[in-house]
Amino acid sequence: MYCRVVHVKAVSEIQLKMITSYIETTMMPRNLSAGQISGEVFEKSPTEIFTVSKFYDKETANKIMGLMKDEIREIAKGCKMSLLEGPRIIEGKSLND
């Protein structure tokens, strides 16, 4: 399992709403159909989100990043973005699962 976390800080609430809508309607469906296991978007503040994407392996993560390269560059022009990623080394599971 490989995970990628992206933090996005927009300059305004409306800009963040546009980015979030684009992720929901375009990027996430395409990425999931291309092999991404799951994707979640979390609100940190009215102008900040972070996304958590899971992949089977780094190769799949890089393939999907390649699909988004131009879009990411365009989004990054108007806001701040940071990226954390790596392979899972520990998995915890709830006793209720």
Q: What are the residue ranges of the model-derived segments?
A:
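Short S/T/G/P-rich N-terminal loop/turn motif that feeds into the first structured element of a domain
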Residues: 1-50, 55-70, 77, 81-97
